[in-house]
Amino acid sequence: MLIKKTGIPHFESKYKVEQHIKNLGIPYTIIGPTFFMENLLGPGLEQSQLALPLSSSTILQQSALQNIAEFSALVLERGKPFLGKRIDIASDEVTGEQAAEILSNVLGYKIKYVSIPLEQVYQANEDMARMYDWYERVATGIDIASLHQEYPEVNWLPFKDWAKLKLR
């Protein structure tokens, strides 16, 4: 996922850090996880809703924190093949509607997907609003199937399995 020139401050600051690391001339590997699945574990679920500033049909690639840790361990174990690379990772991808349906099945009660108007988010936090606007317009573009095939050692969690693990 290219994070340069997105207009999203917290993406662009990460890009600057990555460029600085590359310019230091030291060995490095950069792991670029997508949106964290754990971001969905908010108080809204207790109120039977999943609310995000994305349309219900927008596909959002997501990473489980467990998978980020497992992939990081793999990078540390193998070392050399990963040096000098940036690897973007994602565990799964679902729409808001799909996520709400899966969460409903796991929790045993109806979770309604609510699309928060982006204007409301802009009023509260422009940086976050820009990020969600970008997610709405630009897919992160990770080839999840190829990633998982290339690194089968990672116990990649589909959203449904992640939800069962976290919510039961």
Protein language model regions, located:
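Oxidoreductase cofactor-interface core, primarily capturing Rossmann-like NAD(P)-dependent enzymes
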Residues: 2-112, 121-128
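A hydrophobic C-terminal alpha-helical subdomain
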Residues: 118-168
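Conserved residues in the N-terminal Rossmann fold of short-chain dehydrogenase/reductase
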Residues: 115
